[in-house]
């Protein structure tokens, strides 16, 4: 996993925060498939994900319309339903517009705020 190389702002970030249920129940396979499928969608910029007890996945999109398009992809809708039924005790989705981004000098964008 690496830090997503995003363009200059503005762009859209979809933040998915979750608490899992016990057991895999096919989660790992579906998670890998969703990451692969998202990368094929128009307007996809990248994704970052981390999980311990609390999982956080941030996907980046060129705009709100691209993010909304991903939400409606048929296979993603199946994953959403399965998540509600079997994988998540709790989750929250937040959609935000990134207006400024900066990082470590050795990262993809340098250290200066943009």
Regions found by a protein language model. Name each.
Residues 81-83, 87-89:
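Short arginine-rich
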Residues 1-54, 64-71, 88-114:
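Short S/T/G/P-rich N-terminal loop/turn motif that feeds into the first structured element of a domain
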Residues 57-61:
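Conserved RNP beta-strands of RNA recognition motif
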């Amino acid at each position: 996993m690496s830090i997503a190389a995003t363009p200059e702002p503005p762009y859209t970030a979809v933040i998915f925060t979750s608490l899992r249920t016990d057991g895999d129940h096919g989660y790992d396979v579906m998670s890998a498939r969703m990451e692969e499928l998202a990368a094929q969608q128009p307007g996809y910029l990248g994704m970052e994900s981390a999980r311990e007890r609390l999982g956080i996945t941030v996907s980046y999109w060129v705009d709100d319309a691209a993010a909304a398009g991903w939400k409606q992809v048929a296979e993603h809708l199946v994953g959403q339903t399965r998540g509600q039924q079997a994988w998540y005790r709790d989750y929250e989705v937040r959609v935000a517009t990134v207006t400024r981004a900066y990082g470590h000098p050795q990262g993809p964008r340098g250290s200066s705020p943009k």
